[in-house]
């Protein structure tokens, strides 16, 4: 007999699951991006620069959306996911920009930016997932990744634009460097942080039609905000560590620039810092998903055991067989049904 789970009870898998369109799109989009760069360089046509920005900024985040579409279940439609990506991305960067407009430079700047941006994405995730059924940690992680991908795409487009515009004209090399770095890091940046928050938020509401407040949601929000702040401040942290570890006095920094002798050390520490933050984020997400998976299996096992306890082995005349446990016939309580 097939056991009905929460996911199969709410419509099951979508018919377009597991078709591998995400990696096909990633590969073909990358080829289009390369061809666009070659044509731009060969023709010196600056009208193609926006195409490079859009392809480079949206390719990886939109691939994340396709990855989610092939795995999401329940009442979530493809249109809802695409809307969450585009509308959520636009509203996310606008809301974050408004919250960050009054922030002043200081030691806590990056941390405050992390709290502001994760708050905006969290609120958007609540709006997007309000009517989603079933609410499970896995569903929340997938929807959170979609909202985070939309935010990442529009934010990356802004960074790429700023990198391209200089006093000397369009700096194509700086533009491409910015796009490559942000494209490679986007899955372990905004996508990962919002996926963690979504997994905890939806996991807390498991089996319920509405979201449920628990302290774990607040803890998750603080954790992803701190990870976000550490990620953004990694450049400053790695620079300070380079001075401390090499014993170089801070006075050696002229006009706020790092001495050339420390360039390699700073780069190494920067990459190591990003790797550490990424590993912590992935470990947190995997831990949350495994915790809720075990919890779901325990609940399902208890439900099966409770329902089975009301079954009475009967003989051919509707009378319990000899030796069978005598069980009073009565209506089981509502929580068993």
Q: Language-model features: where?
A:
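Hydrophobic alpha-helical segments at protein termini of multi-pass membrane proteins
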Residues: 1-337
């Amino acid at each position: 007999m097939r056991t009905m789970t929460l996911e199969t009870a709410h419509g099951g898998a979508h018919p377009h699951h597991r078709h591998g369109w995400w990696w096909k799109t990633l590969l073909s989009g990358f080829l289009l991006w390369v061809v666009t760069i070659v044509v731009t360089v060969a023709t010196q046509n600056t009208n193609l620069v926006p195409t490079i920005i859009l392809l480079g900024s949206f390719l990886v985040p939109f691939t994340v959306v396709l990855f989610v579409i092939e795995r999401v279940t329940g009442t979530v439609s493809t249109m809802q996911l695409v809307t969450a990506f585009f509308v959520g991305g636009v509203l996310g960067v606008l809301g974050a920009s408004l919250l960050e407009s009054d922030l002043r430079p200081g030691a806590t700047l990056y941390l405050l930016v992390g709290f502001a941006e994760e708050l905006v994405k969290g609120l958007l995730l609540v709006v997007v997932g309000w009517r989603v059924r079933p609410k499970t940690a896995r569903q929340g992680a997938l929807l959170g990744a979609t909202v985070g991908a939309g935010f990442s795409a529009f934010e990356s487009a802004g960074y790429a634009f700023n990198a391209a515009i200089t006093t000397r004209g369009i700096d194509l090399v700086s533009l491409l460097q910015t796009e490559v770095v942000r494209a490679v890091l986007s899955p372990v940046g905004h996508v990962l942080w919002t996926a963690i928050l979504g997994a905890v938020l939806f996991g807390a509401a498991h089996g319920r039609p509405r979201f449920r407040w628990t302290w774990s949601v607040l803890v998750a929000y603080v954790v992803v905000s701190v990870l976000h702040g550490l990620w953004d401040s990694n450049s400053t942290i790695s620079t300070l560590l380079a001075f401390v570890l090499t014993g170089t006095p801070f006075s050696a920094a002229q006009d706020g620039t790092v001495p050339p002798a420390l360039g390699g050390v700073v780069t190494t520490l920067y990459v190591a810092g990003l790797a550490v933050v990424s590993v912590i984020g992935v470990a947190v997400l995997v831990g949350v998903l495994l915790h809720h998976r075990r919890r779901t299996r325990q609940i399902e096992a208890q439900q099966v055991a409770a329902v089975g306890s009301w079954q009475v082995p009967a003989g051919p005349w509707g009378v319990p067989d000899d030796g069978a446990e005598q069980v009073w016939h009565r209506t089981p309580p509502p929580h068993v049904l």
